[in-house]
């Protein structure tokens, strides 16, 4: 590679005690890529691919992106004058009577076609995933930090009417959405059961008690996991999927339980005569953080995975800290704050690390709820609501950048990715 740029993603902060990911930016510019599309075979579909691919590359923070239509043969001399380094051409090809999405990646500096990537068009509405995979191919060609998270599915529960929520799947931009569980019941709190995203847990309210079910997407089959009076929710899944943390209330007061997916057994691991909920695995699944009212208000605590292990308070700032997620030794949580200048309560996201007292604020206004780490812990998705917008939010921690994807005609109860 003869390009004159460097991706210095790992910074001093990566090794500092607060684990905050800072970025060292070089004086070099980002590689410039021109994203083009062909009007042959299916111009509308190619245009959709083109738009999503360009936005993905912009979102990655790894490229300077421009957009254009196909202009015949690649004029490398003209592109060099424009200081363009790469050209990504998306098109729809027809082979053996079947349409496929195609990406061709040209290296302007060497004047050659470097990559051809085909993605079958199984269903027209799946075009966002074709574009996401294309973005990953382009990104990997430069050996930039991974953006594989872009192709992951979002599973979410959406409100339909009184007492009715359906479970649906989506891509991270929410362009693609498909309902997969529709039964005129309350289906809530979906949580992925494995890294492959072939199964997920969710809570269904039946005629008597809430039940935790495990659903296999490929087989469309259910497995009963647990039930409990009042509350039954899966809040965290271990990295290998062998254990889950559940909030159950068999005796009226909710506690956190550890469930072994192989032995099909559950063990109570909190016993405070109040509220202990929302356990999330920490420290390579050896401990957990959870929300409790032991302080007289919702706050975050930590303990090892045993009933007799003591609980340690993690936060001493704020009077209402809740809705948490964790990745290794990092915790993101929602903090309720004082009324803003418009007289409304603000719910902001904050990030902390176990070995640091530093609190990193991630949002500044509105109601920001349900933070969820990506699989690599470098990004966070959440729901943002203000008087002007309702959207799925994305925070790139390495770059201190955030994006909002409007949620139109859908109200989300809970989600996971």
From Swiss-Prot:
It is found in: Periplasm. One of its GO terms (biological process) is protein import. Part of the Tol-Pal system, which plays a role in outer membrane invagination during cell division and is important for maintaining outer membrane integrity. This is Tol-Pal system protein TolB. The Tol-Pal system is composed of five core proteins: the inner membrane proteins TolA, TolQ and TolR, the periplasmic protein TolB and the outer membrane protein Pal. They form a network linking the inner and outer membranes and the peptidoglycan layer. The gene is tolB. It comes from the Bacteria. Its main location: periplasm. The keyword Signal applies. Residues 1-16 form the signal peptide. Keywords: Cell cycle, Cell division, Periplasm, Signal. Belongs to the TolB family. GO terms for cellular component: periplasmic space.
């Amino acid at each position: 590679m003869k390009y004159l740029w460097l991706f210095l993603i790992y910074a001093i902060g990566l090794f500092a005690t607060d684990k905050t990911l800072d970025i060292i930016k070089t004086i070099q510019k980002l590689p410039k890529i021109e994203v083009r599309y062909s009007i042959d075979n299916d111009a509308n579909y190619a245009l959709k691919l083109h738009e999503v691919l360009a936005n993905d590359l912009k979102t990655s923070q790894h490229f300077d992106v421009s957009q254009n239509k196909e202009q015949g043969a690649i004029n490398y001399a003209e592109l060099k004058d424009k200081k363009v380094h790469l050209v990504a051409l998306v098109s729809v090809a027809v082979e053996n009577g079947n349409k496929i999405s195609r990406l061709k990646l040209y290296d302007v500096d060497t004047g050659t076609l470097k990559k051809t990537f085909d993605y079958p068009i199984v269903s027209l509405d799946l075009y966002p995933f074709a574009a996401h995979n294309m973005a990953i191919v382009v990104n990997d060609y430069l050996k930039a930090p991974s953006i594989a998270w872009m192709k992951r599915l979002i599973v979410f529960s959406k409100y339909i009417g009184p007492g009715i929520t359906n479970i649906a799947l989506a891509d991270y931009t929410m362009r693609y959405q498909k309902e997969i569980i529709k039964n005129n019941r309350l289906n809530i709190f979906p949580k992925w059961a494995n890294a492959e995203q072939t199964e997920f847990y969710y809570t269904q309210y039946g005629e008597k008690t809430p039940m935790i079910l495990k659903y296999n997407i490929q087989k469309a089959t259910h497995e009963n996991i647990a039930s409990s009076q009042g509350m039954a929710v899966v809040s965290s899944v271990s990295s290998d999927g062998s254990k889950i943390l559940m909030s159950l209330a068999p005796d009226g007061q909710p506690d956190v339980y550890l469930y072994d997916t192989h032995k099909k057994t559950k063990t109570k691991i909190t016993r405070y005569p109040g509220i202990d909920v929302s356990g999330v695995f920490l420290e390579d699944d050896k401990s957990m953080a959870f929300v409790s009212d032991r302080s007289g208000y919702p706050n975050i605590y930590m303990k090892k995975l045993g009933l007799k292990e003591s609980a340690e308070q993690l936060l001493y700032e704020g009077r209402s800290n809740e809705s948490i997620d964790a990745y290794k030794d990092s915790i993101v949580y929602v903090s309720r704050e004082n009324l803003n200048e418009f007289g409304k309560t603000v719910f902001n996201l904050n990030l902390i690390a176990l070995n640091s007292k530093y609190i990193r604020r991630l949002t500044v206004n509105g109601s920001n709820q349900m933070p969820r780490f990506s699989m690599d812990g470098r990004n966070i998705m959440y729901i943002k609501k203000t008087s002007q917008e309702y959207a799925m939010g994305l925070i790139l921690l390495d770059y201190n950048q955030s994006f909002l994807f409007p949620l139109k005609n859908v109200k989300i109860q809970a989600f996971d990715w």
